[in-house]
C-alpha cells in the first residue's frame, strides 16, 4: 500500500464582501489574487476594519493595483509609522491571469472589480471579477427576481405549516 499524504484543506475566512458589485455588474469570470500588504495593514485586516465598496482595480505596466480600498489603522502607541489608509496596493497575479485581464479590459470593454476579501490559510486574498456594467432595466429585473424568490419562500413556508 502506498503512503498517502493527506490533502491539505484550505481554510477560508471571509473578511469583507462587496455586495453592491453583483447588483451593479454582470460577473463574467472570477480570479483569486494575493495582496502585497504592510504589517499594520495585516493587523487591520485581522481586526476587520477594511472597506472595499468604492474600490477598483487599475492595470498599469502589466501589473494590477487595488485602489480606493480603505484600511483604517489600529489605534496603537507607535508614532514612527506614517499610515496611509487609501494607498494603492499591488495585487499578486500570475502572468497568464494578468494577460487575460489586460486583454478583456482593453479589447472588449470590461472592467475589473473586487468582489470579496478573505483569508486562505493565513494569507490575505482578494476575489476579482471581470465584469460588464448592467443597464437600469437589468437592475430592475434583478430586484423583481429577488422579491419573487422571497415571496415564494414565504408562500411555501405558509403552505407547509
Curated annotation (Swiss-Prot):
- GO BP annotations listed: trans-translation
Query: Could you confirm whether the keyword Lyase appears in this record?
Result: no
One GO cellular component term of this record is: cytosol
In alphabetical order, the GO MF annotations are: RNA binding
Q: Which family does it belong to?
A: Belongs to the SmpB family.
Subcellular location per UniProt equals: Cytoplasm
So which domain of life are we looking at? Bacteria
Role played? Required for rescue of stalled ribosomes mediated by trans-translation. Binds to transfer-messenger RNA (tmRNA), required for stable association of tmRNA with ribosomes. tmRNA and SmpB together mimic tRNA shape, replacing the anticodon stem-loop with SmpB. tmRNA is encoded by the ssrA gene; the 2 termini fold to resemble tRNA(Ala) and it encodes a 'tag peptide', a short internal open reading frame. During trans-translation Ala-aminoacylated tmRNA acts like a tRNA, entering the A-site of stalled ribosomes, displacing the stalled mRNA.
Q: Report the Pfam families cross-referenced here.
A: SmpB (PF01668)
The protein depicted here goes by the name SsrA-binding protein
Listed A to Z, the keywords are: Cytoplasm, RNA-binding
Entry annotated with the keyword RNA-binding: yes
> What InterPro entries does the entry give?
SmpB, SsrA-bd_prot, SsrA-bd_prot_CS
